Amino acid sequence: MTKVTDWEERYQQEDTPWDKDEPAPGLIDWLNKQTLAPETRVLVPGCGRGHDPSAWAKRGFETTGMDLSEIALADARQKYEDLPNLAFFPGNFLEEKPQEPYDLIFEHTLYCAIEPSRRDEYAKALNHWLKPGGLFLAIHFVFPLTEEGPPFGASKEEIAKRFEPGFELLNDWKPRHFEGRRDEEWMFLWKRKI
């Protein structure tokens, strides 16, 4: 039987060990080197309290954060209200479709939060939310898959196999990480095939 995580309850109970109250270090490093066009539209699904989307918005990109938890989004709106190019909305990345696809999707701790049996849905959802030729930048947890989760583990090989049919892998590397996550994260940059 599949266990469904109640994300709203997790935020209500402050049971959010993944929330480090700052953007992912690997994302900050990548943003410091990126050469994206200023008009790039960015989506951050599973954004929680909005720390990662705020990093994109502070660089001038039109950024949207999306999450299942209204509590997390309310906190994000309050904390980052001074960023006019940052919007947050509730939604299910796997089940909804955008009015207009994005140029880039960034994710950190979403793939690992999804039941492994639904990961094919995740790969399909990327095709709805991302423009052909768009970029998918992700920091994935890489550790053995266990039944207990979230987070649910994955191997680099499983991740590559999941996304390679519709995406070209441009680069992958070990990113700078939060304390306590050494050897648990791997960063990928993909380009959606046309």
What residues fall within each predicted segment?
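Class I (Rossmann-like) S-adenosyl-L-methionine-dependent methyltransferase catalytic domain
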Residues: M1-L43, G48-E100, I114-I194
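Conserved acidic residues
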Residues: D103
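A conserved beta-strand element that flanks and buttresses the S-adenosyl-L-methionine
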Residues: F106
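Short catalytic micro-motifs in class I SAM-dependent methyltransferases
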Residues: T109-A113
